[in-house]
Regions:
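Conserved ABC transporter NBD signature motif
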Residues: 57-68, 72-73
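Conserved ABC ATPase "signature" region
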Residues: 97, 101, 108-126
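Catalytic Walker B motif of ABC-type/P-loop ATPase nucleotide-binding domains
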Residues: 155-159
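Short, charged/small-residue-rich alpha-helical element at the C-terminal edge
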Residues: 218-287
Length: 287
């Protein structure tokens, strides 16, 4: 497992932010974390990256105990924060040089890694451009490039597409998929955009009021999202997989006709991610 969390607690004054949280994330997966404002997403990611201390609980990252192996964990993980984390008066290349040096990279190794990070995020043509002139999409891509400098086995991305145009969002999502597929990097992805989570992630969890209240694979969610229920005149009910082939659907309705039954109601599937999210976290607005 990439990450194993058991019984994590975090309090701020009298408020419980993470409440006996348990979570396991598979190595090599793209894991999506959803939650309303104030659910504890950023706090959880901050704890896993040693920005905020936990109050209680056990955390193992790539087999390392987080209380005993901070150096080892930091060397194999990286956080791409929601805010821009680079110097606007420096060029893209100069920023990567600076942050690469902080990781202890020097000489040819450093410059080879910079070229790789620029290529992975398609920033080669902007390498010598001052980043203060970058669009929102370019800034987000540079954030990711910096996050790749230490060749992380786990990459945390906290709302990495906030405030950018749809084309840039789409490009960044494909960059993230490519990082996962080519490097085998475990991705932990937080977002308010459910369509991003559905597109990217192998596993999806919902964090609400400090607890994991939902955790499933995308495959399982999709399987349940394709089942329609047919209520018949004899009070029975049949389920039909809307993703199955045409013959299976024809056979279902043929069998209904052969039994001289009538369809009283067809209930289409409602188990898409948005409906699951709203049903669990409720529909009231949150501050």
């Amino acid at each position: 497992m990439a990450i194993h969390i058991r019984n994590m607690i975090k309090k701020y004054k009298h408020s419980i932010v993470l409440d006996h949280l348990d979570l396991t994330i598979k190595e090599g997966s793209i894991f999506g974390l959803l939650g309303p404002n104030g659910a504890g997403k950023t706090t959880l990611v901050s704890i896993l990256n040693y920005l905020v201390p936990k109050d209680f609980g056990e955390v193992k990252i790539l087999g390392y105990d987080s209380d005993k192996n901070e150096k080892e964990i930091k060397s194999c993980s990286s956080l791409v924060p929601q805010s821009y984390a680079f110097y606007p008066t420096l060029s893209a290349y100069e920023n990567l040089e600076f942050f690469g040096a902080l990781y202890g990279l020097t000489g040819k190794v450093l410059h080879t890694k910079i070229d790789y990070c620029l290529e992975m995020t398609s920033l080669e043509t902007y390498r010598d451009t001052k980043t203060e002139t970058f669009s929102g999409g370019l800034k987000r891509r540079l954030n990711i490039a910096i996050g790749l400098l230490n060749s992380p086995k786990i990459l945390y991305l906290d709302e990495p597409t906030v405030g950018i145009d749809p084309q840039s969002r789409s490009y960044i999502l494909n960059v993230i998929k490519n990082i996962n597929q080519t490097e085998g990097t475990t991705i932990v992805y937080t977002s308010h955009y459910m369509e991003e989570i559905e597109y990217l992630c192998d596993e999806i969890a919902i964090l609400d009021q400090g607890k994991i209240v939902f955790h499933e694979t995308k495959e399982t969610i999709n399987a349940h999202s394709n089942i329609a229920k047919i209520y018949l005149s004899d009070t029975s009910m049949q389920e039909v997989n809307l993703q199955s082939n045409y013959d299976a659907l024809v056979d279902t309705f043929y069998n209904i006709k052969q039994k001289s039954l009538h369809v009283k109601e067809i209930e289409l599937p409602k188990n898409n991610l948005e409906n699951i999210f709203l049903s669990i976290t409720k529909k009231e607005l949150r501050d």
